[in-house]
């Protein structure tokens, strides 16, 4: 590169103040100079000056610099290149490039000019290492090969490290191309280091596609990474591509063939054929086709699974043919597990191991094992068997003489990989002897034998530890360890002592080394019977007197095997008194009882057992026992399988204690078994196979002093208490109206099955077949329960019962073992006569008292009751006030018919005077003009009868005041004439002033004889308001009845009230009194007549 520079400096005279006046002139001169210089440079270039200097390096030693020649330069032009400040700094070249040694860091000035060409300018350049590019030479591939069985490409090239001045890091980039279109399938980098000399590098790559399937090409380039070089660093050019050469086989079309791959891998299969492939499948699965060059196709399988032992088929189908291969998918060998090496006989080492995870590969692809020993350098190969025992393999390695330490390495290998496991052992500490054989037993004496056996192996250099197992019947096994020196002939002998005479023993043997690694397996059992000896003890003896007290029965127990020391043949029983001994005949072995007829003297009884060797020591017992007056019977309960008896320590007991027991329900003599306990004991557990739950047993504790036994305690008890099996039998002794007396009997001991704790008595009301006491323990309130814990009580009186009532009674006994069954009955209490009498008298007395009180009250209030509920009702037949004159009903046009109106009940009050006014029965209706006797108003109010009456609903009518003034001796006053439409009653003042409001039903009214105009007008005014009018126009009446009354003055116009005429039928409502008709006697009885007073009838 050429740099053109121009340096301008101010002259000193331009600095002072005088120079400022020259500034403008100097600037013009400077610009003129620059312009001339630039024109000269342009003219020079046009004439052929070199330009664009560039330098590169391939090895950091030499820089290759080049420039562009001018267009005017011709052939044969020679350039001179000079570098300042360097010796031999000028170089000549006929080309436009030259190589110069690498320059030091910094700027360097380089000039280039053409020689022999006058007038040409010189080109100057500034060159720095930063402007130099480091571009390595293009690498060269020395060799490219392929392993088609594994689809692996092997690349080899030279790094040319000798051209570099020092150690550098070189980065290689390798590309793999596939198929005819040069598709890049892999681009990787590979780092190496050059150190000043040429080195050949190797690199391998495994293709995911078989190399036979398509063309594979490889190219390489490099990049030098020198940290000290400050210039630009660039990649070299790619090397020429090299291809993998493969010659097609006419037989094989599918690749890879018989491939073994790892489970879970991805694999590609291809079919190389000129035919068109229609489909492809692996196993039973169809796969999509991948098209390659020509008609070649491929399929890719992802995450392939384990194949069968025979492999998995891969098939390509064309129109005419089927091509295929087999693939085997499995695992690499697992690390051998549980590797163990030991010896049985110190002659041969056996190593065993577990292969671990199955590889799923069989046949030639199966795992092979090799056992290598590093100290000796020997190895053995595993010979495969079809079915290894217990999934464990083993190899045998012959021991080397005088070698005890072995270092084994077990190698495992199959087509998918390899693994190994190592073990270091001292073989003398890893001895696992074989099973001892040929066991023999010989007698030494009755308590010792000699054992011999055979143990294969050469154990002369070590000691053996053997264990002897000794078993005998009904005894805990015994293990004895013995240490013996190993021998070469494998025969061993050991004495076993401390045995029991006449005892069957079973012997077994196993062995190991003294350092112990493993016991051998147990040998076969060897049974042996030791010889007999004299019995070591006399029989266990007891005596009982017969029930009549005349004979003494001697009992003894058979000697146990460890005391009999042989087969007992017979027993000898003798008795002595005052040093006189009487011996009985020998008693054969099966019999263990003898009966002696003795008096009440204290004899010493001796019993001796005999076997084939001799007699046992005698067992002695006194015939009489020491009496004990202070003896109480106690109770005890066992623990399920036995019963615990305790007592206080007694130093006077010199020999031992004897506990005997029997079933309490059996007859005398009571003896089931006995047990002797040392004299220093204070308790004993009595156990027997004959004990049964719920059975009462008697236990007797005897203490021995001065060769005599004394009964110390008498105990009855149960091994386990149960509930009674029967209910107590009870009866009713007496019944009354309020109580029941029951009585029951004891339950037999055999059926009680425990200690009786009490009775539960239940009772409730209930009839037979209807009352069932359920859930007696549930606490029902209607069931009464009595718990009887006094066992001496045999009767119970149930009080506070109801008479003539049925009761359900239930009785149950209970023990600590549970509740027994129930016994029930129904009882009816007697009738309570006193209660019945009281029940009758109380209601009668109450009724009498209520009647008397009611009578007194009614008598005192009789008038009020009569007036209130039953007032006197006048007899219409005896009423003369209603008899009118005939003229009243004849031809009087003023009379009018009555009108029917709704009727509501009303009350009619009839006032009677006691003296002045005649009785209503004898009074006749008189004319209004007749003179009426005076009557007192007080008398009118004193005595009146209220009669129920039902008039029609009427309009009220004010009575004529004149009528009141002309009142006669008798009058009828109508009160409380109520209408359903009538307003509430008004005060008397309002009624007197209101003529309409006081009108009601008034059949009789007193009117004046001569009617005035005012009266008529008032009457007309009251027509609408007046109520019931029994008299209308008299002249219009049609008298049908011959007995109808008529007015004597038919011409006089009067208004009649209380008409006897019917409204509709115009019949007289109240017929006149007929003298001829029979009188009503009023003899008919009614409840109302009971309260009425009729003195005049």
From Swiss-Prot:
An example Gene Ontology molecular-function term: cytokine receptor activity
Signal peptide per UniProt: 1-44
Keyword tags: Cell membrane, Disulfide bond, Glycoprotein, Membrane, Phosphoprotein, Receptor, Repeat, Signal, Transmembrane, Transmembrane helix
Database matches in CDD domains: FN3
Intervals of motif WSXWS motif: 519-523
Top-level division of the source organism's lineage: Eukaryota
Bias-annotated ranges (Polar residues): 1032-1067, 1086-1097
Residue positions where Phosphoserine is found in the record: 927, 1044
Extracellular side stretches: 45-833
Domain Fibronectin type-III, residue spans: 46-131, 332-434, 435-534, 538-629, 627-719, 724-833
Positions annotated with a glycan in the UniProt record: 85, 131, 143, 191, 243, 303, 366, 390, 407, 426, 445, 471, 481, 489, 572, 652, 663, 680, 729, 787
Cystines in this chain: 55-65, 82-90, 213-270, 341-351, 466-511
Subcellular location: Cell membrane
Predominant localisation class: membrane
Cytoplasmic side: 855-1097
Region described as Disordered: 982-1005, 1022-1097
Transmembrane segments: 834-854
Topology within the bilayer: Single-pass type I membrane protein
GO cellular component assignments: plasma membrane
Recorded domain comment: The WSXWS motif appears to be necessary for proper protein folding and thereby efficient intracellular transport and cell-surface receptor binding.
Summary of subunit composition and partner proteins: Heterodimer composed of LIFR and IL6ST. The heterodimer formed by LIFR and IL6ST interacts with the complex formed by CNTF and CNTFR.
Family assignment from sequence similarity: Belongs to the type I cytokine receptor family. Type 2 subfamily.
UniProt name for this protein: Leukemia inhibitory factor receptor
Organism: Canis lupus familiaris (Dog)
Origin organism lineage: Eukaryota, Metazoa, Chordata, Craniata, Vertebrata
Encoding gene per record: LIFR
């Amino acid at each position: 590169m050429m740099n053109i520079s121009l340096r301008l400096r101010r002259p000193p005279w331009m600095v002072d103040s005088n120079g400022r006046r020259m500034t403008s002139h100097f600037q013009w001169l400077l610009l003129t100079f620059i312009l001339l210089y630039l024109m000269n440079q342009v003219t020079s270039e046009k004439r052929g000056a070199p330009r664009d200097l560039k330098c590169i390096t391939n090895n950091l030693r030499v820089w290759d610099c080049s420039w562009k020649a001018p267009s005017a330069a011709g052939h044969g032009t020679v350039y001179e290149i000079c570098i300042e400040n360097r010796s031999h700094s000028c170089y000549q070249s006929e080309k436009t490039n030259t190589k110069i040694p690498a320059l030091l860091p910094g700027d360097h000035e380089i000039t280039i000019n053409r020689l022999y060409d006058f007038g040409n300018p010189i080109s100057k350049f500034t060159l720095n290492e930063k402007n130099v590019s480091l571009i390595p030479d293009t690498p060269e591939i020395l060799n490219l090969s392929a392993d088609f069985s594994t689809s692996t490409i092997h690349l080899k090239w030279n790094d040319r490290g000798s051209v570099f001045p020092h150690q550098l890091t070189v980065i290689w980039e390798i590309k793999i191309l596939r198929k005819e279109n040069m598709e890049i399938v892999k681009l990787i980098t590979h780092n190496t280091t050059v150190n000043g000399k040429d080195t050949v590098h190797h690199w391998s790559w495994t293709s995911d596609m078989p190399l036979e399937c398509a063309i594979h090409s490889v190219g390489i380039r490099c990049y030098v990474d020198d940290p000290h070089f400050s210039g630009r660093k660039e990649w070299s050019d790619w090397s020429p591509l090299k291809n993998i050469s493969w010659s097609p086989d006419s037989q094989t079309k599918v690749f890879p063939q018989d491939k073994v791959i790892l489970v879970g891998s991805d694999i590609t299969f291809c079919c190389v054929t000129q035919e068109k492939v229609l489909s492809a499948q692996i196993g039973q699965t169809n796969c999509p086709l991948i098209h390659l060059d020509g008609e070649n196709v491929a399929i890719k399988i992802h995450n392939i699974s384990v194949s069968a032992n025979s492999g998995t088929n891969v098939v390509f189908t064309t129109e005419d043919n089927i091509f295929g291969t087999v693939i085997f998918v499995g695992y690499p060998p697992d690390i051998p597990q549980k590797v163990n090496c030991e010896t049985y006989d110190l002659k041969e080492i056996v190593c065993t191991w577990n292969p671990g995870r199955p590889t799923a590969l069989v046949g030639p692809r199966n795992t092979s094992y090799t056992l290598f020993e590093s100290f000796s350098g020997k190895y053995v190969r595993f010979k495969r068997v079809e079915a290894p025992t217990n999934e464990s393999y083993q190899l045998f390695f012959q021991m080397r003489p005088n070698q005890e330490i072995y270092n084994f390495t077990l190698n495992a290998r199959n087509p998918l990989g390899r693994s190994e496991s190592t073990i270091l052992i001292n073989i003398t500490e890893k001895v696992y002897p074989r099973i001892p054989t040929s066991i023999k037993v010989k007698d030494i004496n009755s308590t010792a034998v000699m054992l011999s056996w055979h143990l294969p192996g050469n154990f002369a250099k070590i000691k053996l530890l053997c264990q002897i197992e000794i078993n005998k019947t009904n005894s805990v096994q015994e293990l004895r360890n013995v240490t013996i020196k190993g021998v070469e002939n494998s025969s061993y002998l050991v004495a076993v002592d401390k045995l029991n005479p006449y005892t069957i023993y079973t012997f077994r043997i196993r062995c190991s080394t003294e350092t112990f690694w493993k016991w051998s397996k147990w040998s076969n059992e060897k049974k042996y019977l030791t010889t007999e000896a004299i019995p070591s003890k006399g029989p266990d003896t007891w005596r009982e007197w017969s029930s009549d007290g005349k004979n003494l029965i001697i009992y003894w127990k058979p000697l146990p095997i460890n005391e009999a020391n042989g087969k007992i043949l017979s027993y000898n029983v003798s008795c002595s008194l005052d040093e006189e001994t009487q011996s009985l005949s020998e008693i054969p072995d099966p019999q263990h009882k003898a009966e002696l007829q003795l008096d009440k003297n204290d004899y010493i009884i001796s019993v001796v057992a005999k076997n084939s060797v001799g007699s046992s020591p005698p067992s002695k017992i006194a015939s009489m026992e020491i009496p004990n007056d202070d003896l109480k019977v106690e109770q005890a309960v066992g623990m399920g399988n036995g019963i615990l008896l305790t007592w206080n320590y007694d130093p006077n007991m010199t020999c031992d204690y004897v506990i005997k027991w029997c079933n309490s329900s059996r007859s005398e003599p009571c003896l089931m078994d006995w047990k002797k306990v040392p004299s220093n004991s204070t308790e004993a557990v009595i156990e027997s196979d004959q004990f049964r739950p719920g059975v009462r047993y008697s236990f007797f504790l005897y203490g021995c002093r001065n060769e005599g036994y004394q009964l110390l305690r008498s105990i009855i008890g149960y091994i386990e208490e149960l509930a009674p099996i029967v209910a107590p039998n009870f009866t009713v002794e007496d019944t009354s109206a309020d109580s029941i007396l029951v009585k029951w009997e004891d339950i037999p001991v055999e059926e009680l099955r425990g200690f009786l704790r009490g009775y539960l008595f239940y009772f409730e009301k209930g009839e037979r077949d209807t009352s069932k006491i359920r859930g007696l323990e549930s606490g029902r309130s209607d069931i009464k329960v009595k718990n009887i814990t006094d066992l001496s009580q045999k009767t119970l009186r149930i009080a506070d019962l109801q008479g003539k009532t049925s009761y359900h009674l239930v009785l149950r006994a209970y023990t600590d073992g549970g509740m027994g069954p129930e016994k029930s009955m129904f009882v009816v209490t007697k009738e309570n006569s006193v209660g019945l009498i009281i029940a009758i008298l109380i209601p009668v007395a109450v009724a009498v008292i209520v009647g008397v009180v009611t009578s007194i009250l009614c008598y005192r209030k009789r008038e009020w009751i009569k007036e209130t509920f039953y007032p006197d009702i006048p007899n219409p037949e005896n009423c003369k006030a209603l008899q009118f004159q005939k003229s009243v009903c004849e031809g009087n046009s003023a009379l009018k018919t009555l009108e029917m109106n709704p009727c509501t009940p009303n009350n009619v009050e009839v006032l009677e005077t006691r003296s002045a006014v005649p009785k209503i029965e004898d009074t006749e209706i008189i004319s209004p003009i007749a003179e009426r006797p005076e009557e007192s108003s007080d008398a009118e109010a004193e005595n009146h009868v209220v009669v129920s009456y039902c008039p029609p609903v009427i309009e009220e009518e004010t009575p004529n005041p004149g009528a009141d003034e002309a009142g006669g001796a008798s009058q009828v006053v109508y009160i409380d004439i109520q209408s359903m439409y009538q307003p509430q009653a008004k005060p008397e003042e309002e009624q007197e002033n209101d003529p309409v409001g006081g009108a009601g039903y008034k059949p009789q009214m007193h009117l004046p004889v001569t009617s005035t105009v005012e009266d008529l007008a008032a009457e007309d005014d009251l027509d609408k308001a007046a109520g019931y009018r029994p008299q209308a126009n008299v002249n219009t009446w049609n008298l049908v009845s011959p007995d109808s009354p008529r007015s004597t003055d038919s011409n006089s116009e009067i208004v009649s009230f209380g008409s006897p005429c019917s409204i509709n039928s115009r019949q007289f409502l109240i017929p006149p009194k007929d003298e001829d008709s029979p009188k009503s006697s009023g003899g008919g009885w009614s409840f109302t007549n009971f309260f009425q007073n009729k003195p005049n009838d």
